[in-house]
Amino acid sequence: VCNAMETLLVHEKVADEFLPQMLEDYFNAGVTIFGCEQTQKFDSRIQAATEEDWATEYGDLRLSVKIVRDLDEALAHIARYSTRHSECIVTRNMENARRFQAEVDAAVVYVNASTRFTDGFEFGFGAEIGISTQKLHARGPMALPELTSYKYLVTGNGQIRG
């Protein structure tokens, strides 16, 4: 699914509390986990993440997990590897949430909500034809109107513009 999570960035302050149960749940669901060196310490089943993993849109039961020091490191990682499709932050800190929304370059930026909402129907556009990550013309979920262009037909009797 094009709006599924590919990479999970976890703040180091919550890693010890959050990751053990999350990893167990994901392994039980058949997800293959790739992780940074810090993440690998949590479970021997975690495979070492490569540079390619951070930039891969798996479309499968695979997830890359990286532990980050702070929001700056998370933003830098996203700026380098993002598909520019959908990005999300889960936080109680609304100052960080606002900064995340302002600085992340993606068609849709979420705070405390699933990226699975990135869908033309969910956005009220009708049947979705595609998702654009470009900044010109349509960006985000697209339906038929976003794929059409205008043609103006002008007929006159010699009018001029003064």
Predicted segment positions?
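NAD(P)-dependent aldehyde/semialdehyde dehydrogenase
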Residues: L9-S114
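C-terminal segments
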Residues: R92-G162
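Active-site PLP-lysine loop of aminotransferase-like
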Residues: V1-L9
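Acidic-residue sensor for enzyme active/binding pockets
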Residues: E6, E57, E87, E128, ...
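Short coil/turn motifs at beta-sheet boundaries
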Residues: V1, Y58, E122-G124
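Residues on a specific face of well-ordered alpha-helices
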Residues: N3, P20, M142-P145
